[in-house]
Amino acid sequence: SVIASLDAAAEASSDAERLAAAKSATVAITRLEREASRDPMARDHISSQALFESLSAAIERRSTFVQVKTKSPVDLQVPFEVAVAIAEATFQALNNSLVHAPGATSRKVTLSSGRKSLKVVIVDNGPGFRMSSVPRNRLGVRLAIFKRLETLGVSAHLNSSPGEGATWVFEWSSP
């Protein structure tokens, strides 16, 4: 259930447990939104506002060290599969920040939508890294995030360099 997933996220003792619980909560919330709607289109889509509310609640339950800001939300209809992939990618990026930049003093997530696009930006002020230094056999950054999003038409970018923190950008445009 949604409440059980959120409680599990709040009480988890490791980053992996928090990530799994937060993902579960987001999926449960978006499914609930989808099932509750009587609009046939909503069975395959979720509003950007519902997605942002779900993400914000799950992130805030998961960590008090992450600021979440929503900018000018326009209620855009987003394919359900795209919304879930963006939510999972957001949690993976936050998990990477928590695990690999534990000394970061700032983590921010900005959620924005326009008439035809949706954007999620995750920024930390950790030590940063070079993408080329991530071993090719690591699935997290390259496969789990970039490949999955790209197959759904979501652009994914990571800007980072040593001493500069990391900025993840996930952007989807409506056809």
Named regions from a protein language model:
Residues F65-T90:
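Conserved short strand/loop->alpha-helix "switch" segment adjacent to the catalytic nucleotide/phosphoryl-transfer site
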Residues L98-T105:
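A short, flexible helix-to-loop-to-beta junction within the catalytic ATP-binding CA
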Residues S117, G128, S161-V169:
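Glycine-rich nucleotide-binding loop
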Residues S133-P162:
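ATP phosphate-binding glycine-rich loop and adjacent ATP-lid/helix-beta elements
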Residues T105-S112:
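A conserved short beta-strand within the histidine kinase catalytic ATPase domain
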Residues S1-K69:
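DHp/HisKA dimerization-phosphotransfer hairpin of two-component histidine kinases
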Residues A93:
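Conserved phosphate/oxyanion-binding catalytic-loop motifs
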Residues D124:
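Acidic ATP/Mg2+-coordinating residue in the GHKL
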